[in-house]
């Protein structure tokens, strides 16, 4: 084992970074965030970027820049946890010890869960405001909608991660279509 932490946070998204900052302010010991992404995106803005209300690049920072002072960054993904031994193993084989573990790794799209989903995205007639890599495609798709076109918004069943945010993207798109005369 190379490192030992009082608190290991798996995930460097908004939740992980915010928690790490709060723990450091409260002087809760040695804190680390394990996240292999090199880029941090402020995800609440994804809907606005997809809806043409914001430029996503304004809400992206190098991961190192958002790690709070005094918090260590392990630039790797955790792939296994041994609760009894209080250790985590990263994708490169690094073993990290911890007293307390916080899991907030975020979500990873499961493209194979729906037959044809990958093909729909590749063809350009499906999009998501919740997958950062597809925000620009979502914006382009929504901008091509013309009067009389049909738009289908999929709202996930609860419990889901921020299920209502799908409606926010839809309302932003409707507002844009209303401004341009596509919607009466």
Where are these regions (language model features)?
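FAD-binding core/adjacent interface of flavoenzyme oxidoreductases
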Residues: 1-5, 72-168, 172-181
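Beta1-alpha1 glycine-rich phosphate/pyrophosphate-binding loop at the start
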Residues: 2-72, 159-184
